[in-house]
Amino acid sequence: DRDSDNDGLADIDEAANGCDPLDFDSDDDEEWDSIELALGTDPAVASSSSRATGVYVVQLPHNRPASPANLKIPLRPFVENADFYLSMDNTGSMTTYFSTLQTGLVTAVQALTCTDLGTSCDADEQCPSNANCSVAGHCVAQTGQCAVNIYTGVAKWDTIDTFVNVISPQSSAASSVLALAGGGTGGGYEEAPTHAAACAVDGSKCLNNTKNCAASGVGCVGFRSDALKVYTHITDANEQCPMSQAARCAMFTPLGVGAEMLSRQIKVLSLYDEQDISGTGTAFDVADGLALGSATQRADGSRFVYQTSYTAVLNDLKTGAQQMFSQLPLTVSPLLREESGDAGAFGPFITRLVADSTLAGCSSATNAADGDNDGDPETYPGVLPGSKICWRMEFGTNATISPGTAAKFVRARLDLRSREAGTVDRRLLLIAIPPQVP
């Protein structure tokens, strides 16, 4: 027998590479000797493996059990993409707010953007200890209070039916600064902040022909679907809808509009002042009601609502964004994505994918839910960014891919999908079919 341990590596080659010809995994790192050589790692040194670089490998020899029997896969969510849509009260008392944001928005967005370290990667393990591997495949310095890719947009409004989407979320903060120009010059004075939020969510709620809704994306605003979508409510006014429109205004409540936001996974960051108060209630009532209705809250139930001023609005915007990046609970679940150009499809070999907390440091899986109705809990609710959460992936027998003279591989990525913010982490997976020694 030229291959005593039946791992696809001839005994003579095992000896030449410092391996045990009677042990298919000489260094006990769960990667077979033949597969380590094919992947360029050292089969005699446990610290040299694909797992050490964050790539998870399972061997599926033809008509034999999987090795290891399952993979325990950790992922760690961080907000990658975020859209901050500045919904601006355009009345005269807000002029200084506009000028403050025009002066500092570009710098604020830069401060909120994670620093790209300029290194390509497939997993966090390939980055420095203070960094993680972004979904785009770059090592980024991760403070837990930044996002990799931030878009901004601007709306202006004053009274009912004056909402205008000046610029939808896009990648240039400088373009949003230009969209802020001329702010504080709106013709109305009886502000309708709740109605403005309703228009941002659904343009059909506005009767004006100037609303300029986006042609694509989420809501009239045009949020990216694969981003944390943040309606940033900025006003110094309470509900002052004109008496002539009282019946129509009554159709739009902060809690009700917030619920419409929740149905589209739009979150609310409220920056309010109380300097222009008349009409009904307070500016806080609207700011907090939108946040409550949209379920934009921390684990303790508190909302991202800040009383501000024109001198503080820029700092409060940054603080609110940073706290959302670190304190907004996420609902996350895994999604397998096949990679092309290999020996077959990965998905058919998986028999179970289930939440698992047995790896060191993994969050409890007690509250995991069965989001895809397959009988196994895989969806974690209430996960804070940066938490380590884990799954167990089990495999059936490989009866379809025969061995060749060289190792064969099937590749896939396990994306971590957040209901609130799209893809928030990923992991590269490999099925390895060991070769057959002639």
Language-model regions, residue ranges each:
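Extracellular calcium-associated, cysteine-rich motifs in secreted modular proteins
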Residues: 1-60
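Cysteine-rich, disulfide-stabilized extracellular repeat modules
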Residues: 5, 17-20, 27, 39-40, ...
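Divalent cation-coordinating acidic motifs and surrounding scaffolds
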Residues: 47-128, 135-402, 418-438
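A short beta-strand micro-motif common to beta-rich folds, especially ectodomain repeats
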Residues: 407-420
